[in-house]
Amino acid sequence: MRKNRAPKREVLADPMYNSIVVTRLINRVMLDGKRGVAAQIVYGAFKQIEEATGNNPLEVFETAMENIMPVLEVRARRVGGSNYQVPVEVRPERRTTLGLRWLVTIARNRGEHTMQDRLAKEILDAANNTGAAVKKREDTHKMAEANRAFAHFRW
């Protein structure tokens, strides 16, 4: 076990939209340390969103994130020799992390030709409260609701 908790690294806001969440999205899209490529993908997707909706892409992205981020999740807790799925509230930092992780993972598995297209379409779907990322959130909430009986095991 580690002696003390690792300090949180400071993430700088991205230069184009001046948003920390956009920087975290770029970091999540990035593969093999190629931040330039990841930034092109994200900014290209945002440009597509702007062309498709005519709205500010940052606002569309924030709406999408609100629709993706979970409020509750289940955690395994061992009590008396059996494991229970205990519903717990998700901390704000983890909400954002899970939302970004689900968004990028699901965008990668979509069928469109380029990652830019996939990301743009998934963000638009999420902003309209449809799409696989929103379904993932609903499934997580359903699991928490189904295991509500074990909420008293919360720690």
Swiss-Prot record:
UniProt KW keywords: Ribonucleoprotein, Ribosomal protein, RNA-binding, rRNA-binding, tRNA-binding
Entry keyword Hydrolase: no
One GO CC term, this protein: small ribosomal subunit
GO molecular function, one term: structural constituent of ribosome
Recorded superkingdom: Bacteria
SUPFAM superfamilies: Ribosomal protein S7 (SSF47973)
Gene Ontology biological-process entries: translation
Subunit composition and interactions: Part of the 30S ribosomal subunit. Contacts proteins S9 and S11.
Family annotation (HAMAP family): Ribosomal_uS7_B
Family: Belongs to the universal ribosomal protein uS7 family.
Function description: One of the primary rRNA binding proteins, it binds directly to 16S rRNA where it nucleates assembly of the head domain of the 30S subunit. Is located at the subunit interface close to the decoding center, probably blocks exit of the E-site tRNA.
UniProt name for this protein: Small ribosomal subunit protein uS7
Organism: Lactococcus lactis subsp. cremoris (strain MG1363)
